[in-house]
Amino acid sequence: MTTKLKGLKELGNTSDPLRTVSYQVRTKMSDYEDDNTDVQSLTVEEEYELWNSNVPVMYEFVSETKLTWPSLTIQWLPSDGQSPEQSLIFGTHTAGEEVNYLKVATINLPAGIAGLDQGDEEDEANDHSSFAIANKFPHIEEVIRARYMPANSNIIATINGKGTISIFDRTLEESKAQVSTLAFHKENGYGLAFNPHISGELLSGSDDTTVALWDIEAAKKPKSILTSHDDIVNDVKWHEFESNVFGTVSEDKTLQVHDKRVRLEPVKKLPTASPFNTLSFSKHSRNLLAAAGVDSQIYLYDMRDMSSPLHVMSGHQDSVTTVEFSPHTDGIICSSGSDRRAIIWDLTQIGAEQSQDDADDGAPELMMMHAGHRSPVNEFSFNPQIPWLLASTEEDNVIQAWKVSMKLVNASPPAISDPSLLV
């Protein structure tokens, strides 16, 4: 059965506080026709309609929800893998017009999208997902970043526009859910990351140029403070294999790698031509690091020798806001940017031969471009349980959940990448 795709274009200017349009895609590759439209000449709305018409060839599932206020942050929560219900966290940015909230939403996926075995007829009867707010907790100032603690996903940390960190327990009732406040930073903060190896250990980075290391289970003062940056700290991330190692990027045009056992100076400090906004350590290869920023490029580094990048990937047309490695598939990266795009990259295709037509469409490692947003993408998140399922949030009050077509995934030619990228 082929499901007709409809309804997304009706969502754009609704005044409803929360409205979702979603569908599970059931189609054949032959249903897609390329009309050779010149994308460069299209308006934002025309680009969106073109993307909507191409959805059948690119996705298994798409859900779009219009919010009352924009969210600057989004993250899937882990699930038990036995139910089609998935949860995610996001926040509000009301610019002082209303109370801000940290929110927990649930989205009920079609069973097939969630990877659960269900009969075709029953699955088709449940093609549409539902998006609902399960919990919301009052929040002082806007929610800049929200992150769950890997050791206990009921514990969520946030950082606001004044640099204040709040710790929530989402199992508690609304009035008691904020269990502690961590005050040190003097300005806005975009860096926030729990150590995946040590329960309660949290990093924060701020516009005040400092990075703070916290133990949220022991004290309300930082364990240590790093002052090695000279300008705004844009992002902080923990290494996926080493519990003492983390990275930071800053407006001071440096990428720094730190070892928390060495308190004074970074163990590696890389000057960059322009500031990086974001960085990510590979979840599969202990020496691989990605970073990106205002020049729109994605840089790949070998941590054993960071004097020059292993490879630079081009595809975005504006500043990159987020970059993350897939938790499921080695060599897969996603990036999002102010150009309204999220791009999935396949590092195994670096250096692959291309026809001229393919080369005109982008580098061989550019696997897929998600063009469903109509304003800059603030952040995205890989679902930790379901491969190829992502959620993304944009400036224009919209959250999208989307799963890449398995036909697109399986269409990739054999891997020929430089093995050094995957060590």
Curated annotation (Swiss-Prot):
Single Gene Ontology MF annotation: histone acetyltransferase activity
Pfam families in the record: CAF1C_H4-bd, WD40
Origin: domain of life: Eukaryota
Keywords, ordered alphabetically: Chromatin regulator, Cytoplasm, Nucleus, Repeat, WD repeat
GO BP terms, alphabetized: chromatin remodeling; regulation of DNA-templated transcription; subtelomeric heterochromatin formation
Residues with site note (Important for interaction with HAT1): L288
Residue ranges of the region described as Interaction with the histone H4 N-terminus: 357-361
Alphabetical list of SMART domains matching this protein: WD40
Family to which the UniProt record says this protein belongs: Belongs to the WD repeat RBAP46/RBAP48/MSI1 family.
Protein name, UniProt field: Histone acetyltransferase type B subunit 2
